[in-house]
Amino acid sequence: MKNTFILLFLLFLFVSCQQKIKPEDIAKINGYWEIEKVVFDQGKEKDYGVNESYDYFQIDNKNKGFRKKVMPQLDGTFMVNDTQEDVKVRFKDDKVFFDYATPYAKWSEELIAISDKELVFENADKKEYHYKKAEPLNISDDGKKTK
C-alpha cells in the first residue's frame, strides 16, 4: 500500500511539473540553436561538445516556417546552403508537434519544453534532443558586435 501511494505521488508530481506550451511560446524558437545532448529512451545520454553546425528556425505567426543547418564562421557570420526542412507547428491534445517535410521524407517531433535559452524535442523513437540558444561566433579583435 505504501509503495502504491509513493508511486501515485511521483506520477502526479511528474505530470504536474510538465511545461504547458502556449501558442505565444512558439516565437521563442526563432533563431539559432546548438544541440547540447541527446537522451535515449533507456536514459543514456550523448553529450555534444563543440558543434560545427547549428539549427536555425524561422516560424511565422501562422505556425509555418523552416529549419536549416548553418555553420558558424569565426567572423560572426554563418555559412548556409539551399537545403532546408519545411516546418508546420501543430497543437493537439495539449501537446505541440513540429511536422517536418523535405522532398524525401516527412516526420514529426513533439516539443517538450521551450524557454528563451533552452529547447527540447522528442522524436518517435523516444529520443530527446536538448538544445541551447546559440550566438554567432566572433573572435576578431575589432570589438564589434556581430549581427
Task: Annotate each PLM feature.
Residues 29, 57-65, 91-95, 112-119, ...:
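Short, solvent-exposed coil/turn segments at beta-strand boundaries
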Residues 1-8, 19:
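Positively charged n-region of N-terminal signal peptides that target proteins for export
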Residues 46-87:
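N-terminal glycine/threonine-rich, aromatic-flanked beta-hairpin/loop signature
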Residues 122-147:
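Edge beta-strand at a domain terminus
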Residues 19-34:
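N-terminal helix-cap/turn-to-beta initiation motif at the start of protein domains
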Residues 79-112:
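An anionic, turn-rich surface loop/hairpin at beta-sheet edges
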